[in-house]
Structure formats: C-alpha cells, structure tokens
Amino acid sequence: MCGPAMFPAGPRWPRVRVLQVLWALLAVLLASRRLWAIKDFEECTWQVVLNEFKRVGENGASDRFFEQELVDTVGNLFHMLVDSPIDPREKYLGFPYYLKINYSCEEKHSEDLVRMGHLTGLKPVVLVTFQSPVNFYRWKIEQLQIQMEAAPFRSKEPCIAEEVCSMSWYTPMPIKNGSVVTRVDVSSNGLGTFIPDKRFQVNINGFLKRNQDNDIQFTVGDELFNLMPQYFVGISSRPLWHTVDQSPVLILGGIPNEKYVLMTDTSFKDFSLVELSIDSCWVGSFYCPQSGFTATIYDTVATESTLFIRQNQLVYYFTGTYTTLYERNRGSGSWVRVLASECIKKLCPVYFHSNGSEYIMALTTGKHEGFVHFGTIRDGQVSFEMLPREWSVCEQIGVTTCSIIWSDYIAGEYTLLLLVESEYENASKRFQVVSYNTANDDLELLYHIPEFIPEARGLEFLMILGTESYTNTVMTPKGISCNPYNHLIFIWGNFLLQSSNKENFIYLADFPKELSIKYMTRSFRGAVAIVTETEEIWYLLEGTYRVYRLFPSKGWKVHISLQLMQQSSLYASNETMLTLFYEGSKLYQLVYLMNNQKGQLVKRLMPVEQLLMYQQHTSHYDLDRKGGYLMLSFTNFCPFSVMRLRNLPGPQRYTRQERYRARPPHVLERSGFHNENSLAIYQGLIYYLLWLHSVYDKPYADPVHDPTWRWWENNKQDQDYYFFLASNWRSAGGVFIEMDSYEKIYNLKSAYELPERIFLDKGTEYSFAIFLSAQSRSFRTMADLGTVFELHSHVDVGVVLADPGCIEASVKQEVLINRNAVLFSITLKDKKVCYDQGISGHHLMKSSMTVNVVGSSGLCFQETHAGARMQGNLMVPVFIGCPPGKRLAFDITYTLEYSRLKNKHYFDCVQVDPEMPCFLFRDIFYPFFLIQDLVTGDSGSFQGSYVLLVVGGGPTLDTLKDYNKDEIYRFNSPLDKTHSLIWTTRTKRTTKDSAFHIMSHESPGIEWLCLENAPCYDNVPQGIFAPEFFFKVLVSNRGVDTSTYCNYQLTFLLHIHGLPLSPKRALFILMVSLSVFVGLVIFYIAFCLLWPLVVKGCTMIRWKINDIIASESYYTYASISGMSSMQSLRRSRMGSMFSSRMTEDKAEPKEAVERQLMT
C-alpha cells in the first residue's frame, strides 16, 4: 500500500467540532506527559557493532558475523604471565570478533557522551545468551549465558589530547559449538547516565564468504546497494516465516517481478537486498498449468541452517556454511532445486523444531493433488516425503476432488492439521479440518467448517453448535494455525474460529466478515496479530474473545499525530508495510518510508499498548461542568489500579538458565584503559571458561561441584600473593587476573516477573503470588445464617491450563482490607501422570499456564519509563519432562570413604591414578551416585533405583571392548546358566522379567565373581603383581525409578585390581614356582658341598703353577755369579722345606703359603 497508507481508510469518521477539540486536547496532554518523561529520563540508547580481532580501536569499523574458526593468536601472551594464577601450559584461544559498545543521546555528540560516562564510572554489562541447538543428538541441550563487563579502550585515531579523544568499550564476542543464534543484552552498571537496557540479535551468517579480493559477499546471490522505491512502494505485505528462536538469518521476498529478497542476521536491525542466483526457469505442463510467469519470490522460509524459497511452481533451498553445527562441506555451493517433477503451489512453515530436526511442508497441485510433501532438515541435510504414504487425503475422506489449502504441523504430537477444500458432484464446495498422524499413518476428519458465517446477534463470540442462524456470507477459509503451548487453534479467512480441543470451535464476532485475513503472526506467548488483505492490523489476546483493530483506528491517529509532532524518524505520511512479525513478546513492523522523495527501510515497534490505551481514552470520556467550565475525565475500565508479582522463587531452578560471570583483567595503567594485549588476554580467559564448561561432563564427580574449581584449585592459597604483586604494579604482562572474577552464578534473583519458561520435573511445584490493589468499593460482605461475615472482592483471578490432566493449579485468595488489596497465591504442580522418562532436555511435553485477571484483557496498562505495558494477562510456556542441566555422576569420594569403612581397609593400585582410583577384587564394592544440577549447583545423593550393567571391559585401556546384547545378558543377569557372571549382589529386587538386579543407595553392595566364562576370568598378569581389569559400567534408572522423569544414563570405567587366577593357571604357576624354588635349593646345597673341594683343587693347581715357575727360574739363572747361585740355592732349599711342611700340615691357608714362597 502507498500514499497515506498508515492513516485510517474507509468510512468517514464523524468530524464533530467538540470531538476534534477533544482529540487535539488529548494529543497535547499525552504529548506533554511524554515530554515530561523525556525530561526526567533522557532518551539514551546503547549501540553495538562487531569488530574483527585486528580492527579493534578503528573508528567507524563494523563487521559482519560469519567467521567461525577460533584464532590462535593469544597463546603467546599467556606465556608471559609467569606470576599469574593461570597455567600457561594450557591451550588458550581467541574469538574472531569483539563487541564494540557505545551509547548516544538525542542531540548530543556520542564521543563526548562516552568519555563522560567513563569518567563517571559507567561500564556496560553485556549478557550473551546462546540459543540451544536443534539437533540434541549431536549437541547438549542447555540454556547458557555469560555475563561480561566491557573494557574501556582508546581509539587508534590520532589525538592531540594527552589522555583520550574518543573511546569505546569492548568485550569478546564468544562463539559456542552448536549455537548460531545469539542474544546480546546490554545494561548499565548503575553509575553515570541512565540508559535503558537494550537487546541485540548477533547471529552467525553462514551465507557469506570472502572472495579472492578479500571482500565479503553473499553465497546465495549478489548484494544490491540501491534500494529503489519501486521495489517497495505500494507492494503487499508478506509473512515472515522462520523457525522460532532458531533461525540466524531471516529472509523476506515478495518484491514484484524481481528475484530479490531481503536478508538479515540481526532481525532487521541491519539488512541486505540480494538478487538470488537462481535460473528462474518456468516449466508448464498438462499437470501443472501456469497462466503466466513472474520472477517474484513468493514464499520464503528460514531454518537454523537452510533457506527455502518458492518461485512460481519451483522450490529451491540453500544450506549455509556453519562449522559450529556440522562439517564445512555441508554448505551449498548454489541453490538446489527440489521436487522438480512436482507443481508446488505453496510452502507452509513449521515454527517449532522437534526430535532434533526442523520441518517444512510443500503443498502440491496437479497430479499429486491431495498429498503433502513433508520436508525434514537436520544438520543441513534436506529430505522430502510425500504424505499420506498410501491413499490421498481425497480418497480417505471419500471425495473425488479436493485441494489442501493449508497445513500446520504439531511437532510434539506428530500430527499434520490439514485445511481441505472438497468439491462434490453438485459443484458445491465445503471445507474440512483433517488430522493426519505421521507416526502411524492415521487420518481423521476432525471438523466440518460451516458453509456460511454465523449470525452473532451482537455477541462478542458464539459457540458453533449447529443450531445457530447464519448470514448469507460464505465462509472462505485461508489458513489454520496451532499454538503448541496452549493448543489453541485458529482457522482464519473472512472469519476467525478458535478452538482448544480441535472439536469445538468458537466464532469471534468482533472481526468483520467484510474483511479477509491475509496472514497471522503469533508471539506464542499469548498474543496474535492479524493482517488483512487491505493491510489492516488487528490484535487478539489468546484465550479471550475480543478482537481489536490497531490500524486504522482512533488510537493510531492519536499516536501518529504525536510522532509527527516530535519529528520521529520512524514515521512518515507516506509509508508501506512490508511485514509484521513478533520478536519475543514484542510486535514489530518493517516499513518503507518516503520523505521528500527519499526512501528508507526501518524496523519499528508496533505500540500495541499505546494504541489500545489511546483508543480507550478517545472512546470513553466524560465532560463534567465544574462551575463555569467543562472538565474532561476518562473512564477507567480496569478492575484494579496496581498489579505486582510477589514471592517469586529463584528463576534458575525453573528456567534452567546457566550463567557465568567474567570480568576483564585489571590493567596496571593509571588511566584504566586497556590495550590490545589485555583485550586478547580477556578473549583467552573467556574461551577457557567456556571450554571448562564444555568438558565438565566427566563421569567421576569432582569434590567441588563447579566447572571453575579445577581452574583455580592449585592457586587459591596464593591469592594474596598475586594481589600483592598487582597492588605494587609488579604483575607480569601488565595485567592482574582476579580469580573471583570468573565464576558460575547459582543464585540469580527474580526480576519481579514470571520467567520466560518453566520446566517441571515429576511432582515439581512453582509458586508465586499476585498483589492487586483494587479500585474503590471493590469489596462486599457475605454472611449466612449462623456464620461470621466474610469479605469478598470484585477482583477475581482465573488460571487456565493447557493440559489440566497433566498439571494442576491452586489459587488461594487473601483479602487485605487495610490496603484495599487482594493477594492471590498461585501454585502450579505437575500431576506425575503425563510423561514417562526421557534424557535431560529431550522430547519435553509443551504446555502452558495463563493467569488472567477477570475483565482486564486489553483494558489495563502500566506506565513505565520504557512506555506503556499491558497488565492482567500472563502466559508462561511450561515444559514437562526431564529438565536440561541434570546429570548422574559417580560419587567416587563417598564410595571410597564408605568402602574403607565397611571393608576395614582400602588398597589402591601400585601405580596410583588420582582420576581413577582402584578397587580390590575381594572387597565388596559399594557404589554411590550423585544427581548434579548444573544450573543451581545442587549436588545430592541419588536416592532412586537403578540398574547396573557391565557393558564392556579389557585388561588395559587400549584393549577395551564393548559387549553385545547377548554378552551383556550373560555377564550381568542372575538368570545366566553359562557361568559367565562378572558380579553378583544379595539384592533380591529385579526387573519385571527378572533379567537384571535393581539396586539403590541402600543395596548391600556388589561382589565380584568373574566366573570361568567371563572376560575377566583367567587374566595373565602383566608383571609381578596380580591381574587388573577395566570394567565399562552402565548405570541407568530407565523403567525402574518412579521418583523422576529423568532417564539418567551414566557410563564410566571402573579399575579393579587383585583379580584371582584360574585354578589351572594358579597350579601351573605354583608348579613352575616350586620347580624353580627346588632347583635353587638343590643348587645351593650342591654349591655348599662342592665349594671346599673346588677351593682345594684351585689351590693345588696354583701351587703347581708356582712350583713350575720357580724351577724354570732356577735353571734360567744357573750361570750367574756365586752369590746369586747361593741365593738361588737358599731359595730352593727353603722351597723344599716349605714343601715338606705343606705335606705335614695341609690345613695351612693359601695366604701363608704365598708369604713363604716370597720369603
């Protein structure tokens, strides 16, 4: 639409002079009230952009988020930190981007403001929330946040000032595997200028790449930088379809005769116009008649990793490059055409993922009329299946010709809701709602839509029973939509039908039958926005029956008058709405503005509360004469004046939100500004903190239940020393890392509002209270005969549960007469009947709780500095099942203590492993387990029942083997007759089929057997010590524990030493040992007996050798002089005498003989 599009069109409103004056007066009053608010709270806002690692400090730098690989440039800096509590031998990496944070106020220079804020102590606090992934089979389901404090950094631009000219704050932009959607909330630390909190979408764009010139470009097509007015002015708005909270990149088509789309990774804070690189071919045939060809991209759907488009009858998809989700080679190189032989008339989105996958539906015409092509997307891989699998919908509902107009998929129920148009032999057409179950291929006709629109006779709504009267206007359905939380179904066209059970429908008469709904957008938090074919906008609160027109309306006229008076850049007299969509619980418009022949595409908030309030004020007022003048007064239809939530419990136990806190390291510079090195160190610390979180899934529980405990375990005692170094400016690297600045937060306080979601385990309760300050004369007294008076209030609260058979709510009213108020205490409780058991965070049942103050819907508002806020209607999604963040862990600490107590001793392995202590085979093994809550920090003994199975093992860690089902049965079942049992217990309780023992924390313990056919039987020792064995143990409470919805499964290794040998091997070793021992004894005895003889023989041989030597010496020197001869003769005689003496005394030692020979 074009021209004065956003002004009221249609019948001319009565222009009574008094009414014009009153409207003008109302505008002035509201404007002045707004101006007062501005004066009290200066309108300032946060500004956030991305900067690459190497572009920190550059003015005007802004980068796109597509790099996903960690950078290895910070490790060298950590090697410099020798006197710091960190371990420089660990691996520290950095992220490719920083968040650059500034703020601006109206009519003030941003650089001056930031500098002033820094000098007054202002520091931005950044909360990064990672969206959990779709495929929970690959990634862990968790709700993770990290809270960082931004570090001040001087600009690198030249500056003549001594200290600083321009500056900004920076924090690392962390990346987490499995998450491509990131929410950044920026708030103030409470010092300096008041700046309201602001939320930014900072998502990874997997459809960008660098070309050969190092420029960034789109992979899906070519980016256009000139947004021509003819692309947007006067076009019809289109719905924005995507997987809720999971799509990092949104895509919007609908530009006439061009294959252009708008793409954004910031929820249209920034956007790009892209010409898609598709072939734009047109294939017409006898089964796919086409009256003409157009390049327009009609339908667009965005999922976590893949984009879908429809052009004419052709469907294409493109998978982005997301290395944080799957392998790099999964990304598409070009658009892929699917369902090439089909004639596709429409794409239908599926807003919620399920079973680790996302879905999309393609409605066909021609040869496969009556079938739906059901697409499944997982890890970037796309597959389609035609449903129903055998007979078409037409054949199963008993008509010859039918057409599926719309389809909606209820993921949790595996059910397709089909809106079917049937044509009968008399050429009449009727519409039905058909349900098809994809799991069992069941099709059921749910509801026949009436042929004509009912006659409401002045009522707001009408229950369709078949007995009411009808108008002459034919019902023309166009779509069907279901909210999986409250199960509320809408059928829409030139009417609006509502149902909560798929059987009984209510006609909402406030929506005029002269209009036709083009599309609906739902917040899935209780609000619905409707766009008609004439671009009117209507609004509905789910569970109520009043439909409000937002545009055109009296409220809109007042609102736009105020905006134009304030010269807002978000409004113009000539504007065109491109789409209407919800972001969280807020409604936004994407609007093209024309001002002075210049076009601008903006995203703006649709002020629903303001419009309803203005509309109420302009429609209900009184003129009372007070003396000589008239006084204007407004009627307040709200049943209460003040509404507050009280007694709210800590949110983390129910929202399952994990949060870490990380502050930047302290820099040893008097100005307090960081440098590139300190920011890089901050990057490395954030990376290591997230790495500790990711690896904190060990089967053996730490003595302290906290992922950061091991980081500072060995340095806590030196904390004062590190502080001493920092206080004396002697810390290495110029930074001081404070250990207490990196921690996990377990005690978040409630924000005085209901949580974003509630997770309920078996029998869990959630309690809170609503305080309502009533209007005057809101109490009455009631008394029966013989009873005391009781106070009753006109203010009532109703609680609507989507699944009353699964959850229950109780409301207790307390009248506070002295405060003219009522306190309603509400308790929501799980009834323990609607869920079996599931893995933590998997296959949760969706439900909801809606709290409504009777008579308040659309009538009660609260004024805040951020604008009006609707009150009286609260809707909270409820997830029933095993909450995320719970796990089972082996309590090794208590197991060792209890085993030492019961067995009177404890013997560890010879080679001690502190990460895996050993247990002695002959001792009774008493295992204990912990239920650890990663969100709240609670860690307590598992009190439920479980089954323990040995599912693998080996004598060494390198020879571990997983057992098959038959082996697991033989090694663990008390019914085994093959002598293969590994262990046994005196516990008598078993599973229903008696196959396995059921144990608990009170069980008498495990006795190791290792019978002759068990794998641990007859192991060969690896050394002189007894054999060892590693058992792979599985512990599960599946089917045996009724205390929780959680299906806990824990697999861990158990090191057993001191295993006995088999009798044969023991006898063999005994015989060998005895043989060796006997041989050694015999050898010793023989040695002792033969040794003297050996000594004697050796002595005789030596004597003879000496005698021979002496004789040879005599004859050799016979010719020498007389004295020499005499001396020789003397020696010879003495030798003879010595020989005679030896004959007489043979006991003389060998040493004496030698001395005699030398004499």
UniProtKB/Swiss-Prot annotation:
Keyword Disulfide bond appears in the UniProt entry: yes
Record-level GO cellular component terms: CatSper complex; sperm principal piece
Compartments (UniProt record): Cell projection, Cilium, Flagellum membrane
Coarse class of the protein's main subcellular location: membrane
Residues of this chain annotated as glycosylated in UniProt: 102, 177, 355, 426, 574
TM region positions: 1066-1087
PANTHER family: CATION CHANNEL SPERM-ASSOCIATED AUXILIARY SUBUNIT GAMMA, CATION CHANNEL SPERM-ASSOCIATED PROTEIN SUBUNIT GAMMA
Topological domains annotated Extracellular: 36-1065
Domain of life: Eukaryota
Family named by the database record: Belongs to the CATSPERG family.
Protein name, UniProt field: Cation channel sperm-associated auxiliary subunit gamma
Function: Auxiliary component of the CatSper complex, a complex involved in sperm cell hyperactivation. Sperm cell hyperactivation is needed for sperm motility which is essential late in the preparation of sperm for fertilization.
Pfam families: CATSPERG_beta-prop, CATSPERG_C, CATSPERG_Ig-like, CATSPERG_NTD
Oligomeric form and interacting partners: Component of the CatSper complex or CatSpermasome composed of the core pore-forming members CATSPER1, CATSPER2, CATSPER3 and CATSPER4 as well as auxiliary members CATSPERB, CATSPERG, CATSPERD, CATSPERE, CATSPERZ, SCLO6C1, TMEM249, TMEM262 and EFCAB9. HSPA1 may be an additional auxiliary complex member. The core complex members CATSPER1, CATSPER2, CATSPER3 and CATSPER4 form a heterotetrameric channel.
